Amino acid sequence: MIINSLKRFGITTGAAASAAAKAAVIGLLNKEKRSTVVIPTPIGLRLEIPVEKVEIDSEISCAEVKKFSGDNPDILDGLVIRCCAKLNENNEIVIIGERGVGKVTRSGLKATMGEMAISPTVREMIINAIREVTDKGIQITIEVPNGETIAEKTLNKMVGIVGGISILGTTGIETPVSDDDYLEHIRCELNVIRQSYDYVVIAPGNSAAKYAAELFDSNCIIKVGDRIGDSIKLASNLFKKVILAGLPAKLLKVYAGIFNTHYSQGDARLESLTHASVLAGLPYGTLTKISNALSVEEAFTYMTKEQRRKVMNIVAEKILSRIKSFNDNINFCVIIFDYDGESLSRVGC
């Protein structure tokens, strides 16, 4: 089978910030203006990323990198991420978010409430990139010149991030998973897996795939992005067993019958979580907090681990009943992970 078109991968805002930080440190210490830098990523790949501009002063150096989204429809494509570096008195690397970087105003997100929206994974990426240049103490300031304006066109405010964009990315790489042509890629990958396995694990994203790899052979796991329903339909015609493994936010959309989980196709995450929580018999006070939360992650902070398990079991059972309608002759399984990777529910396995 031939894929008719090759899709371009992109880089995350976190990878852009890491590249800008490394270029700024090279400028600061070596007085050198690099046109590209190579950075390490959490998945072991190294990325060579173009640097748009480097400005060097006696005590500070700044570099700019443009976010590149590949063939993903992304409003952040082309956005400039600017990092400035100066020496720190101790040997630590301090990372500060300023103009255009959002601030976290609600609990449950990857960054702590009150901090700037720079994920722990990105902070580690930046530190690793800088440590390839020096072991000296460095202060990095991240700015996104047009971040506050662009953020108004994103969902950041709805989840409790205000004043700018988030600096995110679990792998550093942005995969083109949201367009129609990506289905052909999924079909090809399923056919490859079929040659060696009679089952397949459908994982919407990087974290789901990572957690699933602790339970299954990584070679039988396929990342499908938003196209969950289409991928399950394709897989149900090829395998004896199809396992859907994901995190709560994505799978709560499937619970509501939204099988393409791209934001443009609808959103019922908190409504679904509230509904399942009612069915699970959670206390009224907890239900109120859940329904008023801005994100699933925040809502989870109001629930005990046992309550999460009870609610997610209801969600998994409903999802299982939905996907069984695709093919009655297939053994389907649904696994829902907590945000720390622990399995909250496992139905049909």
UniProtKB/Swiss-Prot annotation:
GO biological process: anaerobic cobalamin biosynthetic process; methylation
EC class of the enzyme, as a word: transferase
Record keywords, A-Z: Cobalamin biosynthesis, Methyltransferase, S-adenosyl-L-methionine, Transferase
Any one Pfam family match given in the protein's UniProt record, by short name: CbiD
Catalysed conversion reaction: Co-precorrin-5B + S-adenosyl-L-methionine = Co-precorrin-6A + S-adenosyl-L-homocysteine
InterPro entries in alphabetical order: CbiD, CbiD_sf
Single GO MF annotation: cobalt-precorrin-5B C1-methyltransferase activity
Keyword S-adenosyl-L-methionine: yes
EC number in record: 2.1.1.195
Transmembrane segments: none
Pathway(s) per entry: Cofactor biosynthesis; adenosylcobalamin biosynthesis; cob(II)yrinate a,c-diamide from sirohydrochlorin (anaerobic route): step 6/10
Presence of keyword Methyltransferase: yes
Superkingdom of this protein's organism: Archaea
Family: Belongs to the CbiD family.
Name by which UniProt lists this protein: Cobalt-precorrin-5B C(1)-methyltransferase
Native source organism of the sequence: Saccharolobus solfataricus (strain ATCC 35092 / DSM 1617 / JCM 11322 / P2) (Sulfolobus solfataricus)
